Amino acid sequence: MSKTIAINAGSSSLKWQLYQMPEEAVLAQGIIERIGLKDSISTVKYDGKKEEQILDIHDHTEAVKILLNDLIHFGIIAAYDEITGVGHRVVAGGELFKESVVVNDKVLEQIEELSVLAPLHNPGAAAGIRAFRDILPDITSVCVFDTSFHTSMAKHTYLYPIPQKYYTDYKVRKYGAHGTSHKYVAQEAAKMLGRPLEELKLITAHIGNGVSITANYHGQSADTSMGFTPLAGPMMGTRSGDIDPAIIPYLIEQDPELKDAADVVNMLNKKSGLSGVSGISSDMRDIEAGLQEDNPDAVLAYNIFIDRIKKCIGQYFAVLNGADALVFTAGMGENAPLMRQDVIGGLTWFGMDIDPEKNVFGYRGDISTPESKVKVLVISTDEELCIARDVERLKNTK
């Protein structure tokens, strides 16, 4: 038996989950927020209890020390050496990492170099990796990349229709994201359907604050909606998703607050999507409350959101030449029945039909009717478990 920590580190946060392996039992989980800011918050959940502390945590190394000391303080572990592996979620692996890898100095350097592909994510992940290596130098650290699952895409799918020198010289191409989530829910869908994954054509819809949709052909990613960065695809919580790129120089010319391309991209990443259109929130619960109040901006934001998701799912029916099932996962995908109802309502031509008694908050499983030609599934994603499994698989290979 061993204990493995799955880590998702951001620029100012560190989310974690501790597993007993190979039993895959969750021993504890938590998050450290506001790293580098005043009044940092450390939350630990274990044995049905929740402990919260307000601290000043200056960097990721200090955050990791607090996390490990809390595990001992609350009796979850007796000593650091009970932890036998650490797994880190890394958003961008580019073309360098086609699968999960054991961390060494070169790998860490490459992750930092790939920050250009995920400037909001990779630097935080690198800081988390460095902190754990400093504090637990003898324990195996493994990186699990969001992009790895999508390296199976064909060249004609991942290349953009621009001069090829931009790919050969600068590696401009579609990379995708959320790969760990898409891989996990596809595996779970195969179990639920009682069929080998290698025989299935699935469309997996990861709909949270970030939104990505993937065409899964026989267990491999055939296409996915996120692109060179996670900004591409359908409308999201704070991200615009796909727009005409000519809008960027136009806005720089017209709006004095947008001084350069970086300003526009920041607006598209952080101030757009549901939040930007509605002026209310990036949270679907707040948008749905706005629908109840007939708030016109909430209605508009919701309608754009549904429209973009339907279009994306529809194109993947074409990519796969049909599908056996559509899988909803992540925060909104799992917990927004109205959104699922309205998305499926625009896809009935493909032979999908959902049971309103099953399409309710909290239900997991097959929500389609017996007559539905394409099954509609709601599956809880578990990226942390995928990370822990890869640590278990790789920890003796370094």
Swiss-Prot record:
Cell location: Cytoplasm
Catalytic residues (UniProt): 146
Record pathway: Metabolic intermediate biosynthesis; acetyl-CoA biosynthesis; acetyl-CoA from acetate: step 1/2
Sequence positions that bind substrate: 89
Keywords: ATP-binding, Cytoplasm, Kinase, Magnesium, Metal-binding, Nucleotide-binding, Transferase
Binding-site positions, Mg(2+): 8, 383
Reaction equation(s) it catalyzes: acetate + ATP = acetyl phosphate + ADP
Entry EC no(s): 2.7.2.1
Named cofactor requirement(s): Mg(2+); Mn(2+)
Cofactor note: Mg(2+). Can also accept Mn(2+).
Site residues by UniProt (Transition state stabilizer): 178, 239
KW Metal-binding (keyword) present: yes
Transmembrane segments: none
GO CC terms: cytoplasm
Gene Ontology biological process terms in this record: acetate metabolic process; acetyl-CoA biosynthetic process
MF terms (GO), sorted A to Z: acetate kinase activity; ATP binding; magnesium ion binding
Binding site for ATP: 15, 206-210, 283-285, 331-335
Record family assignment: Belongs to the acetokinase family.
Cited function: Catalyzes the formation of acetyl phosphate from acetate and ATP. Can also catalyze the reverse reaction.
PANTHER family associated with the record: ACETATE KINASE (PTHR21060), ACETATE KINASE-RELATED (PTHR21060:SF15)
Name used for this protein in its record: Acetate kinase
Protein's organism: Streptococcus pyogenes serotype M4 (strain MGAS10750)
